[in-house]
Amino acid sequence: MDRLGSFSSDPSDKPPCRGCSSYLMEPYIKCAECGPPPFFLCLQCFTRGFEYKKHQSDHTYEIMTSDFPVLDPSWTAQEEMALLEAVMDCGFGNWQDVANQMCTKTKEECEKHYMKHFINNPLFASTLLNLKQAEEAKTADTAIPFHSADDPPRPTFDSLLSRDMAGYMPARADFIEEFDNYAEWDLRDIDFVEDDSDILHALKMAVVDIYHSRLKERQRRKKIIRDHGLINLRKFQLMERRYPKEVQDLYETMRRFARIVGPVEHDKFIESHALEFELRREIKRLQEYRTAGITNFCSARTYDHLKKTREEERLKRTMLSEVLQYIQDSSACQQWLRRQADIDSGLSPSVPMTSNSGRRSAPPLNLTGLPGTEKLNEKEKELCQMVRLVPGAYLEYKSALLNECNKQGGLRLAQARALIKIDVNKTRKIYDFLIREGYITKA
């Protein structure tokens, strides 16, 4: 509504021109780059390119006018304000004097328009915001549903996850034990009295200064932990694992400098190097295509398919060396053959590889007392027991896969493995379980 300027018909109510100091008459110009205060010019000063201090003649500008309809197509904004001012001056019902003061409308038009828009239906159907927009903007009267927050997690006191979080209490946003927790002990016996000597007084003040420096260090460490999101360590580690191995090594090296550059700058630095790594890998792939004489992506897809086929053939030729490892154990050899048959038929290996000399398969994980168990259903508990995965880690992996699936509209196994980066067999079982239960969909 800035372009309305002043609706008043009195020129003295409008701001003066900065060029000639005359009263502004619509339309006039407002500089869009200067201000505050706003920089107004009349048309004459604007056309001759008036400049003053920081204002230049090539600045962008706005045309200030009230010559447009607001409530009725046949009434301009200037006439609306003139009608209201005339009613205030002449009184309600004195429509002849109102029309004489306006000069542009008859008394019948003034009465009809005023009664319609300001008495019978004031500012509802005729305002700039229609009823539909007003209904959408209306605040709902229903209760706001409550959703428990899991970030940061709220483990039970003295649980394993609580110890991993250094005793952090999310409800209080503080720790059970502070850094340098006994810093206050040095002050417990200090008492300032008037008969202290200058040396003793200076010594006590030095102890207080040391205590203040220890408090500053405590707050500095808290700020670093909060700014960098180190409260939920497992979530932090999960985010770190989404990078390739080379970027993870850089992440580990540069972590000690994160407190210096700040969280945003540190994340930008890591993301830029991750992008650089992706670009280098893509350049290397394109160089491989060019070395092989490939100049278009259609041929590149054929090349990748044939290369993958050659790799599979090479792996099959090395199976003999694997068989030789179990040649002395007939039972293990039969298990290996059945496992390879399942793989060739596209099934997951149903027989785990064991040998008389090897270790036994691990028993199912006991979930009793582990944090997060109460958030799992029976099928999820069974999955965590079989793959020996703690509930907290499973919930983080599940959340990461769900977010990625919603973002991409589907998820492939290769994407899941690149995202959570744990044992590939465990990843496959988690991925198959989430697909089977309908949590995610295949891409």
UniProtKB/Swiss-Prot annotation:
Domain SWIRM stretches: 356-443
Sequence positions that bind Zn(2+) 2: C31, C34, H55, H59
Cross-link Glycyl lysine isopeptide (Lys-Gly) (interchain with G-Cter in SUMO2): residue positions: K132, K138
Subcellular location, record wording: Nucleus; Chromosome
Primary residence: nucleus
Domain (SANT) ranges: 70-122
InterPro entries: ADA2-like_ZZ (IPR041983), Ada2/TADA2 (IPR016827), Homeodomain-like_sf (IPR009057), Myb_dom (IPR017930), SANT/Myb (IPR001005), SANT_dom (IPR017884), SWIRM (IPR007526), TADA2A_B-like_dom (IPR055141)
ZZ-type zinc-finger residues: 12-69
Keyword Heme: no
Binding residue positions for Zn(2+) 1: C17, C20, C42, C45
Residues with Phosphoserine modification: S6
Gene Ontology terms: biological process: chromatin remodeling; mitotic cell cycle; regulation of cell cycle; regulation of cell division; regulation of embryonic development; regulation of protein stability; regulation of transcription by RNA polymerase II
Region (Disordered): 347-372
Classification via Pfam families: Myb_DNA-binding, SWIRM, TADA2A-like_3rd, ZZ_ADA2
UniProt biased composition (Polar residues): 347-359
Molecular function as annotated in GO: chromatin binding; DNA binding; transcription coactivator activity; zinc ion binding
Ranges of the DNA-binding region feature: 426-435
GO cellular component terms attached to this protein's record: ATAC complex; mitotic spindle; nucleus; SAGA-type complex
Family annotation (Gene3D superfamilies): 3.30.60.90, Homeodomain-like (1.10.10.60), Winged helix-like DNA-binding domain superfamily/Winged helix DNA-binding domain (1.10.10.10)
Keyword Lipid biosynthesis attached: no
Keyword annotations from UniProtKB, A to Z: Chromosome, DNA-binding, Isopeptide bond, Metal-binding, Nucleus, Phosphoprotein, Transcription, Transcription regulation, Ubl conjugation, Zinc, Zinc-finger
SUPFAM superfamilies: Homeodomain-like, RING/U-box
Oligomeric form and interacting partners: Interacts with GCN5 and NR3C1. Associated with the P/CAF protein in the PCAF complex. Component of the PCAF complex, at least composed of TADA2L/ADA2, TADA3L/ADA3, TAF5L/PAF65-beta, TAF6L/PAF65-alpha, TAF10/TAFII30, TAF12/TAFII20, TAF9/TAFII31 and TRRAP. Component of the ADA2A-containing complex (ATAC), composed of KAT14, KAT2A, TADA2L, TADA3L, ZZ3, MBIP, WDR5, YEATS2, CCDC101 and DR1. Interacts with CCDC134.
Known role: Component of the ATAC complex, a complex with histone acetyltransferase activity on histones H3 and H4. Required for the function of some acidic activation domains, which activate transcription from a distant site. Binds double-stranded DNA. Binds dinucleosomes, probably at the linker region between neighboring nucleosomes. Plays a role in chromatin remodeling. May promote TP53/p53 'Lys-321' acetylation, leading to reduced TP53 stability and transcriptional activity. May also promote XRCC6 acetylation thus facilitating cell apoptosis in response to DNA damage.
Xref: PANTHER family: TRANSCRIPTIONAL ADAPTER 2-ALPHA (PTHR12374:SF20), TRANSCRIPTIONAL ADAPTOR 2 ADA2 -RELATED (PTHR12374)
Protein's name in the database: Transcriptional adapter 2-alpha
Source organism phylogeny: Eukaryota, Metazoa, Chordata, Craniata, Vertebrata
Gene name in the database record: TADA2A
